[in-house]
């Protein structure tokens, strides 16, 4: 019998009307714990693929937010992988891709890779960001940002800053 059920049975038998907190077998992801154990802390970047938006929180306060373009959703090889990552490094400038391997090559001003697979946050000059651009005209998996947004993030972010990419 689970701990929650045991508690409920006890209170039912006692005839008590109470409100109890369930006992969880597995604890889910938390940004901060009340017990003082920090999981991601309160400085992190969140990227929402479905809404094509990014939020960057520094010390619990919204530092900036922006529309983005993520990986080309209609091509599984280019879709941005959801997950919990961290900023791996910071490079400025950086050449991404090679014609020989990826079939493209582009220079970016601000490069912040997140997983080891070569996907990251970077500036890319596009006519628009957000909306449904990513479905058929998305990136090769990276999170494309307007230049001014990429610069602000690059100037503030540190290596190991958590990056949550949600579907």
Predicted regions and their residues:
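Surface-exposed, secretory/extracytoplasmic low-complexity segments enriched in Ser/Thr/Asn/Gly/Pro
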Residues: 1-68, 72, 84, 92-104, ...
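Structural recognition of the beta-strand scaffold that forms the well-ordered cores
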Residues: 45-48, 55-57, 64-66, 86-89, ...
């Amino acid at each position: 019998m689970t701990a929650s059920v045991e508690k409920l049975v006890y209170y039912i038998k006692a005839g008590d009307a109470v409100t109890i907190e369930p006992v969880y077998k597995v604890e889910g992801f938390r940004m901060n714990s009340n017990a003082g154990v920090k999981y991601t802390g309160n400085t992190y970047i969140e990227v929402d693929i479905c809404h094509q938006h990014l939020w960057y929180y520094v010390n619990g306060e919204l530092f900036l937010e922006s529309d983005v373009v993520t990986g080309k959703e209609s091509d599984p090889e280019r879709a941005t992988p959801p997950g919990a990552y961290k900023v791996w490094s910071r490079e400025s400038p950086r050449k991404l891709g090679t014609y020989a391997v990826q079939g493209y090559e582009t220079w970016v001003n601000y490069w912040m890779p997140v997983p080891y697979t070569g996907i990251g946050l970077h500036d890319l000059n596009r006519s628009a960001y957000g909306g449904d651009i990513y479905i058929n005209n998305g990136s090769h998996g990276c999170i494309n940002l307007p230049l001014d947004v990429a610069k602000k993030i690059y100037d503030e972010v540190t290596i190991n800053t958590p990056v949550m990419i949600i579907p």
